[in-house]
Amino acid sequence: MAEMQDYKQSLKYETFSYLPPMNAERIRAQIKYAIAQGWSPGIEHVEVKNSMNQYWYMWKLPFFGEQNVDNVLAEIEACRSAYPTHQVKLVAYDNYAQSLGLAFVVYRGN
């Protein structure tokens, strides 16, 4: 009989969770794509122990009309600095469809 092994897994929050972790260049490309689609970026964060809850805290308001990727990246870093143990997620709101166009975790916390 085969020996049973522990199946190592991590929590999956969105589609990109199944891919290797994103580097800064790939995160920048996703933000650029969201802005090019006309979506409004926003940042959410939550404690790691509560990360499977439906509600994540908003970091400020969504950045309606934001066209500068660097401003969004700066806000992600500000959120990460303010809450170093929290998970930080980028969301992009599609105003036309009134739904999320994009959402992924950019920082998994400590």
UniProtKB/Swiss-Prot annotation:
Keyword Nucleus: no
Cellular localization per UniProt: Carboxysome
InterPro entries: RuBisCO_ssu, RuBisCO_ssu_dom, RuBisCO_ssu_sf
Keywords from the UniProt entry: Bacterial microcompartment, Calvin cycle, Carbon dioxide fixation, Carboxysome
Deletion phenotype: A double ccbL-ccbS deletion does not grow in air, grows well with 5% CO(2), a high-CO(2) requiring phenotype (hcr) and forms empty but otherwise normal appearing carboxysomes. Required for growth in ambient air.
Keyword Flavoprotein set for record: no
Induction of expression: Produced when grown in air or in air supplemented with 5% CO(2). Part of the ccbL-ccbS operon.
Recorded GO MF terms: ribulose-bisphosphate carboxylase activity
Main location: other
Practical applications: Expression of 10 genes for alpha-carboxysome (Cb) proteins (cbbL-cbbS-csoS2-csoS3-csoS4A-csoS4B-csoS1C-csoS1A-csoS1B-csoS1D) in E.coli generates compartments that resemble Cb, contain RuBisCO and have its catalytic activity, showing it is possible to make artificial, functional Cb using these 10 genes. Cargo proteins can be targeted to these organelles. Alpha-carboxysomes are assembled in the complete absence of this enzyme in this bacteria, suggesting carboxysome-based microcompartments can be designed for applications such as custom chemical reactors or delivery vehicles.
Pfam families documented for this protein: RuBisCO_small (PF00101)
One of the GO biological process terms: reductive pentose-phosphate cycle
Source domain of life: Bacteria
Further comment: The basic functional RuBisCO is composed of a large chain homodimer in a 'head-to-tail' conformation. In form I RuBisCO this homodimer is arranged in a barrel-like tetramer with the small subunits forming a tetrameric 'cap' on each end of the 'barrel'.
Subunit details: Heterohexadecamer of 8 large and 8 small subunits. Interacts with CsoS2. Forms a CsoS2-CsoS1-RuBisCO complex. Holo-RuBisCO interacts with the N-terminal repeats of CsoS2; binding is sensitive to ionic strength. A fusion of a single N-terminal repeat to the C-terminus of the large subunit of RuBisCO (cbbL) shows the repeat can lie between a CbbL dimer, making minor contacts to CbbS; thus each RuBisCO holoenzyme could bind 8 repeats.
Family: Belongs to the RuBisCO small chain family.
Function text: RuBisCO catalyzes two reactions: the carboxylation of D-ribulose 1,5-bisphosphate, the primary event in carbon dioxide fixation, as well as the oxidative fragmentation of the pentose substrate. Both reactions occur simultaneously and in competition at the same active site. There are estimated to be 270 RuBisCO heterohexadecamers per carboxysome.
Record-linked HAMAP family: RuBisCO_S_bact (MF_00859)
Protein name: Ribulose bisphosphate carboxylase small subunit
Organism classification: Bacteria, Pseudomonadati, Pseudomonadota, Gammaproteobacteria, Chromatiales
